C-alpha cells in the first residue's frame, strides 16, 4: 500500500493542492472528504457526511469544516481555508502548512511563528464520528 506525503511547496500552491483529495469512509457508509489543504471545493466535501435513513436515502453533511485559530502574543493566525466565488479565498490558512501525510491517519503539520502544530484527523470505522487531535 502506498501513502502520500506533500511538502510546503505543493501545499501552498493552490493550483496544485486543490485538485488532490482525501477520502476516508467507514462501514456504515459515512465518510470524510476534502482537499489536502482542507478546503471544501465540492458539494460532497465535509468532515462528517453520513447517511440518515430516517430522513431519506441521501448523505447529509453534519460537519462541513472546523477552522482552528492560533493566538500567539495577541496575534491571531487562522488555519482555515475557504473558497468563495471568483476564486476568492479566505482565510488563507494554507500558507502555514509545512507538510501533509496520509500515512494511516491524515496528518497536517503547521508552523505559525515559533510554534509547530500537528493536526490528525481520525475517522471511526464502526461509528459515525471523526476525532481531530492537535498536538
Walk through the language-model features, giving the residues of each.
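Terminal accessory carbohydrate-recognition/targeting modules of carbohydrate-active enzymes
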Residues: 1-135
Amino acid at each position: 500500500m502506498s501513502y502520500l506525503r506533500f511538502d510546503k511547496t505543493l501545499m501552498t500552491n493552490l493550483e496544485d493542492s486543490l485538485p488532490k483529495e482525501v477520502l476516508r469512509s467507514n462501514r456504515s457508509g459515512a465518510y470524510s472528504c476534502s482537499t489536502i489543504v482542507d478546503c471544501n471545493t465540492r458539494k460532497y466535501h465535509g468532515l462528517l457526511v453520513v447517511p440518515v435513513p430516517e430522513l431519506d436515502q441521501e448523505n447529509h453533511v453534519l460537519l462541513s469544516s472546523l477552522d482552528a485559530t492560533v493566538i500567539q502574543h495577541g496575534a491571531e493566525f487562522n488555519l482555515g481555508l475557504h473558497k468563495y466565488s471568483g476564486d476568492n479565498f479566505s482565510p488563507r490558512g494554507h500558507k502555514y502548512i509545512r507538510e501533509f501525510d496520509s500515512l494511516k491517519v491524515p496528518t497536517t503539520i503547521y508552523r505559525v511563528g515559533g510554534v509547530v502544530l500537528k493536526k490528525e484527523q481520525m475517522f471511526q470505522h464502526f461509528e459515525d464520528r471523526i476525532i481531530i487531535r492537535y498536538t
